[in-house]
Amino acid sequence: MTLRAGIVAVQGDVSEHAAAVQSAAGARGETAEVVEIRQSGIVPDCDLLLMPGGESTTISRLLQRERIAPEIRAHVEAGKPVLATCAGLIVASADANDDRVAELDVVDVTIERNAFGRQKDSFEAPLDVAGLDGPFPAVFIRAPVIASVGDAEVLAEWEGRPVAVRDGPVVGTSFHPELTDDSRIHDLAFFEQALA
């Protein structure tokens, strides 16, 4: 089976996410065709969506201007999986605590932006993530913190604060799972649901 994975390709680690999705698919004997999303009309044909990091205000503006935001909401309402990382999580949230961000409101969380510091304060930490065997090497770069959680399920915490959640078909992380050689977060977000 070949799954079509769409990556919102405004900013962020697009090629790294593509490699992680393809690795996760390959580990299950499947294939993933990766397409970049910069305009409307692509999301409806995707089985999986990735919303990478970058600058949340820039991502939000593109999603609104190109009319991609309603397509992402429809994708989620159809129960199709999404992985939103770092700034992608900020945009996907119910409340980004930033008037410049038009939230998609597909993850019932409130965000505190850049809570883990500036770029120079970046770090890697082993996380126990619900659904994964063994710690995940999470890379935090100017990472947001999930300040409060509504109906979402907390999948991982760092120092007592949520950093990974699942809300229906959406998995959101404060960290960058694509910056490791470990594709288990992509597998957890996508293939456990898409192949079920």
Question: What do these predicted ranges mean?
Answer:
Residues M1-R65, E71-E77, S183, D187, ...:
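N-terminal beta1-alpha1 cap of cysteine-dependent amidohydrolase-like domains
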Residues S56-D128:
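Cysteine-nucleophile active-site neighborhood
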Residues D13, A92, T180:
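Glycine-/small-residue-rich active-site loops that bind phosphorylated ligands and cofactors
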Residues G26, A96-N97, A130, I146:
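Short polar/acidic secondary-structure junctions
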Residues R113-A196:
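Amide-donor transfer/coupling interface in amidating biosynthetic enzymes
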Residues L3, E30-A32, K80, A102, ...:
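A structural micro-motif
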Residues V10, A87, F175:
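Cofactor-binding loop segments of dinucleotide-utilizing enzymes, especially the Rossmann-like FAD-
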Residues L50-M51, A84, T173:
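Redox-cofactor binding/interface segments in oxidoreductases and associated redox assembly factors
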